[in-house]
């Protein structure tokens, strides 16, 4: 399971996409598979245009849709895990340093 507190995420370079009426269509250029995102998925996808911390994604999602943190966390982790399985994003783990 993805840990949002010590990971950051970015779009894979082999994916192209377009947005229509708030929804997005993604095309994985190597596999030729298309994916459709609803407006919430589109918001997350747009934020992945640069490497972004999982906690920052969670904050945006929670604030935009006024949902409880645990619900937003579950939905975000599910989406990011699906993106990762399909090769649509890269995940960067951060080492946690203790003093």
Question: Which residue stretches match the model-derived regions?
Answer:
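Long, charge-rich, low-complexity alpha-helical segments
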Residues: 33-99
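Acidic, low-complexity/disordered tracts enriched in E/D and polar residues
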Residues: 1-42, 46, 92-99
């Amino acid at each position: 399971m993805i840990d949002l507190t010590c990971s950051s995420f970015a779009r894979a370079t082999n994916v192209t996409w377009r947005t229509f009426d708030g929804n997005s269509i993604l095309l994985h250029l190597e596999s030729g598979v298309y994916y459709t995102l609803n407006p919430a998925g589109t918001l997350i996808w747009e934020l992945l245009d640069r490497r972004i911390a999982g906690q920052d994604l969670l904050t945006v999602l929670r604030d935009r849709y006024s949902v409880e943190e645990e619900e937003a966390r579950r939905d975000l982790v599910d989406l990011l895990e699906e993106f990762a399985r399909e090769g649509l994003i890269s995940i960067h783990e951060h080492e946690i340093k203790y003093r």
